[in-house]
A protein has these predicted regions:
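Hydrophobic (often cysteine-bearing) scaffold residues that line and stabilize catalytic clefts
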Residues: 101, 105, 156, 160, ...
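N-terminal leader/targeting segments and the immediately adjacent pre-domain N-terminus
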Residues: 1-148, 170-177, 208, 264, ...
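Short, surface-exposed loop or secondary-structure junction motifs
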Residues: 134, 141, 194-390, 397
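A general secondary-structure junction signal
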Residues: 125-127, 187, 291
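Residue-level detector of conserved, well-ordered beta-strand and adjacent loop positions
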Residues: 138, 149, 184, 355, ...
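Short active-site loop at a secondary-structure junction
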Residues: 116-122, 143-205, 242-251, 314
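Residue-level preference for non-acidic, small/hydrophobic
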Residues: 109, 123, 129, 161-164, ...
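Catalytic loop of the DD-peptidase/beta-lactamase superfamily, centered on the K-T-G motif
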Residues: 2, 16, 21-27, 93-135, ...
Length: 436
């Protein structure tokens, strides 16, 4: 895959140098319509705040079916680990408390996305629980000439795992779930399993992708499965790929199994449990992709003929949200760590535990920026932490940065071609927005 070098040009936009002449960006600047809001800081709603109001929108037509399987981006592959008890990431970068230039930020993001062929993109920036800036670019539905707005919802793919992990950690705090006990027993399953080792897999191992549970895409996109619950149950009948706790392999199946546990313990449907426990207390709204159709207000996306793959991913990658919704969740986790009295979703000890990295496999080339994984969080190696997500025509990222900023960028389209590039785009956009 060709690598991109991102630099800010004299006009404050992104210039792209490709390592291979075989890759290029398509599209024109005509798509870069921008809707933004960064005039005054807005305090994040707490538990008593009303939910975000979505404006009425026209139901977009069905998308042209894709002829390819949806692809999910996995941070890494299987590798033997030596320890999962290292300390959480710490930083010494001073917090940024100066002005934030939303227009400069937008210029960088738009140049890297919709100006090069993406359908739409949205961003949100927060600091210490306050909204600094939100913006949207491009078209929510180009076939209907519907522009994207700050209320447009995007498929957030594996960023969904952060929501699932947060709810699980709440239940660990409450004593309803034991982090280091087998999940099967807590789910009321006593076997027999196709692989007896399944009965020993702990909740922590599911959260950290060290369970050995299969990562096969066939679990989700084969066998005529229609729901994530079916995918999870199907996985229980598979042989583990390694002894639990001895290796790391990123697997969506882990989080579908956690979804089953969440439903069992709370007595609520998974979507309801996430809304009540994670989203509503911080004034965020989102929905789990429920049908083959795109809802009004959702960004247009590619589809796979005859398959509702978002529904099958569920707790692992099925949420649809605005950039601000995603930023609010990450910001609440950060507040729980740095200002426990202001935390609204989990205790500081839980966030600290979520940020303890498991060793990342040695790859060629090595993982970008020394990335590693915790409990439902990606640790980016520079002190930033959050999560990324990539699936058919969708790129998503939310990052809690060492400078105190929380940034989310959600993209519908194929540019950049991976979330590694979005990390660089965020760095450049923040640099432009905070330049003296």
């Amino acid at each position: 895959m060709a690598r991109r070098a991102w630099v800010i040009g004299a006009a404050g936009v992104v210039a792209v140098a490709l390592a291979s002449a075989t890759s290029s960006f398509g599209g024109t600047a005509a798509n870069s319509a921008v809707t933004s809001s960064s005039d005054a800081a807005t305090t994040v709603a707490r538990a008593t705040a009303p939910p975000i109001t979505e404006p009425p929108a026209t139901e977009p037509p069905a998308t042209e079916p894709s002829t390819t399987e949806p692809l999910t981006t996995e941070p890494s592959s299987t590798s033997t680990t030596s320890s999962t008890t290292s300390t959480s990431t710490t930083t010494t970068t001073p917090a940024y408390n100066g002005p934030f230039d939303g227009k400069a930020f937008d210029a960088v993001v738009a140049s890297a996305t919709v100006d090069h062929g993406d359908i739409s993109a949205g961003v949100a920036v927060m600091r210490d629980g306050e909204v600094l800036h939100t913006a949207a670019f491009g078209m929510e539905n180009p076939f209907e000439s519907t522009p994207a707005t700050t209320h447009t919802r995007f498929r957030i793919a594996s960023v969904s795992k952060m929501l699932t992990a947060t709810a699980i950690m709440q239940l660990v705090e409450a004593g309803s779930i034991e982090l280091d006990q087998p999940f099967a027993g807590q789910l009321g399953l006593d076997g027999p399993f196709a692989d007896p080792r399944v009965g020993a897999v702990t909740v922590r191992q599911l959260l950290s992708h060290t369970s050995g549970v299969t990562a096969s895409r066939g679990i989700f996109f084969g066998h005529g499965l229609e729901t994530w619950q079916q995918a999870a149950n199907n996985a229980l009948g598979q042989v583990l790929q390694f002894d639990p706790g001895t290796a790391f392999q990123y697997s969506n199946t882990n989080y579908c199994l956690l979804g089953l546990l969440l439903e069992s313990v709370t007595g609520q449907p998974f979507e309801t449990a996430i809304r009540k426990r994670v989203l509503e207390p911080i004034g965020a709204t989102a929905h789990l992709a429920p049908t083959f159709d795109t809802k009004a207000g959702d960004a247009l996306h590619a589809s796979v003929a005859g398959r509702n793959y978002m529904e099958v991913l569920g707790p692992a990658g099925g949420w649809v949200a605005t950039p601000l919704d995603v930023a609010k969740v990450a910001s609440a986790l950060r507040l729980s760590e740095i200002a426990p009295a202001d935390g609204t979703v989990v205790a500081k000890a839980s966030v600290d535990a979520m940020r303890v990295p498991v060793p990342v496999p040695v790859e060629d080339p090595p993982p970008v920026n020394g990335w590693s994984y915790g409990l439902g969080l990606i640790l980016f190696g520079d002190g930033s932490w959050g999560h990324t997500g990539t699936i058919e025509s969708t790129h998503a990222i939310v990052v809690n940065r060492p400078d105190g900023l929380t940034v989310s960028v959600l993209v519908s389209g194929k540019v950049p071609d991976n979330t590694d590039d979005l990390v660089a785009v965020i760095d450049l956009a923040v640099a432009a927005a905070t330049a003296p």
